[in-house]
A protein has these predicted regions:
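Small-residue-enriched transmembrane helix-hairpin modules in multi-pass membrane proteins
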Residues: 213-347
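A structural signal for hydrophobic alpha-helical transmembrane segments in multi-pass membrane proteins
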Residues: 1-93
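Membrane-interface helix caps and helix-loop-helix hairpins in membrane proteins
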Residues: 26-27, 163-172, 383-391
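Membrane-embedded catalytic interface detector for glycan/lipid assembly enzymes
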Residues: 56-225, 334, 413-426
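Hydrophobic core segments of transmembrane alpha-helices in multi-pass, intramembrane catalytic enzymes
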Residues: 36-43, 126-134, 172-184, 347, ...
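Hydrophobic alpha-helical segments
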Residues: 315-318, 323-426
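Transmembrane alpha-helical segments in integral membrane proteins
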Residues: 127-145, 264-277, 352-357
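Membrane-interfacial loop-to-transmembrane alpha-helix junctions, especially the N-terminal start
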Residues: 2-11, 72-77, 144-154, 360-373
Length: 426
């Protein structure tokens, strides 16, 4: 997997989209902040570009013949179902999250109570559900005959995983799961030399459109719970602080706010997508930031250690000068909070580390497809949000590292890894 290309094309499409979008900034980006962001983004691409070369120096090309897709898929579904059950027990039985689908009440309870050990285990194992459909597609692409029950199991696990997240008003889990699955489908067909017919591009576009509609509907539901008009969100939300609709667009939205509330909520998604770079500029200009040395980027390992009663502490975001809750600062904002002026160096090293497993997939390690699908989602959402800073990205990334062990078999066995004569690495 040449991950740097995904990141590069994402940045190009993001820039072109900004030029065409009917939005205008409320503030000017400071040149110094912009150059820092661009330099750091370039270093992220450089880290991904160097990773394949470095991986070749460390590990010569060898044949991997001990990974069974069928075994990995079946074990993954079992563990994912167990993890989702643990998550439900933790949230609704142990921590008292209400069952009335009130997003804000659910979030208040989760923020006021500490996760139990059952909840942490459930979050890690449940995140395997993100790859349930992707592995089923891999099995089908490899020629295995799958029953309707096989597909039903995976669809059910995938749906429950997304539904649990949407129950607290989160859209990012849905987005990560969909992007990861779409990447797996397209990548697998290219890897096996199968044609990518028009439907394989139209279906992902239709799915992304559906995700946008669902996200807009969720936003309307949240605004309704808050008793706010959608137009107020466009003009006065945290996103609107830096990005507003153009004058003509604002007039049109005002005239149609009652007849087309979904379009109004959809415009909020544009603000959601494009406000991060401007927020990064504001935050990078804050002179009194106390940098956290990695506690934000690597919050999940710290959380796991804290569950073991090591009490390493957490980041108090409310005490950080210039940090605003409820907004995003692209992928690089949390990394800047951690490392400050060393951001380009930190970005290079982080993406070098992230790119090494992706390089192994490019050389035939199909077991790493789930990991690379999350990395693809991370690259696609790079200009918007840092997935490592959220449960929707960090847990699947860690969980994906379990997959190679789930399909590992001892001895010489029939293996689903693509052999050199049919492998065409994208």
């Amino acid at each position: 997997m040449l991950a740097y290309r995904y990141l590069g094309w994402t940045l190009v499409v993001y820039g072109l989209g900004y030029v065409l979008a009917p939005i205008e900034p409320s503030i000017d980006i400071a040149p110094g902040s912009l150059w820092l962001w661009l330099a750091s983004a370039a270093m992220c691409m450089a880290g991904l570009r160097v990773a394949p070369w470095l991986q070749r120096q460390w590990q010569p090309a060898v044949a991997h013949a001990t990974f069974s897709l069928r075994q990995a898929s079946q074990r993954l579904n079992l563990l994912a179902a167990s993890g989702l059950l643990c998550t439900l027990i933790d949230r609704y039985a142990l921590r008292g999250v209400p069952l009335d689908f009130d997003f804000f009440a659910a979030r208040d309870v989760l923020e006021a109570t500490a996760p139990t050990a059952i909840g942490v285990v459930g979050a890690l194992l449940g995140a395997l559900a993100c790859f349930s459909l992707g592995l089923m597609v891999a099995r089908a692409t490899d020629g295995e005959r799958l029953t309707s029950l096989d597909w039903a199991h995976s669809v059910a696990i995938f749906s429950v995983y997304v539904g649990i997240s949407m129950g607290v008003g989160s859209r990012s889990t849905l987005l990560v799961a969909i992007i990861s699955t779409m990447f797996s489908v397209i990548w697998l067909r290219k890897a096996w030399g199968r044609p990518l017919h028009l439907r394989y591009w139209l279906v992902p576009l239709a799915v992304l459109l559906l995700v946008a509609v669902i996200s807009a509907a969720l936003m309307l539901e949240r605004l309704d719970l808050m008793g706010l008009d959608p137009m107020l969100s466009i003009e006065y939300s945290g996103y609107a602080y830096t990005v507003r609709p153009s004058s003509g667009t604002l007039l049109w939205l005002t005239e149609h706010s009652d007849s087309a509330p979904l379009l109004v909520a959809g415009f909020s998604l544009l603000q959601y997508v494009y406000h991060g770079l401007f927020e990064f500029s504001l935050f990078a200009q804050e002179p009194f930031v106390e940098h956290t040395g990695g506690s934000v980027t690597f919050w999940l390992p710290l959380k796991l250690l804290n569950v073991l009663q090591l009490n390493l502490g957490t980041v108090d975001f409310e005490s950080i000068a210039g940090w605003r809750e409820g907004i995003f600062t692209t992928f690089l904002g949390p990394l800047y909070l951690d490392f400050g002026g060393l951001l380009p160096v930190a970005a290079f090293l982080l993406f070098l580390a992230l790119g090494l497993p992706a390089a192994a997939l490019h050389r035939g390690r199909l077991a790493l497809l789930p990991y690379c699908s999350v990395l693809c989602a991370l690259c696609v959402l790079f200009p918007v949000v840092n997935l490592l800073d959220s449960a929707s990205g960090a847990y699947p990334l860690v969980a994906s590292m379990i997959v190679p062990w789930l399909g590992r078999r001892r001895g010489q066995v029939q293996c689903n890894e693509p052999t050199p004569d049919r492998w065409q690495a994208p």
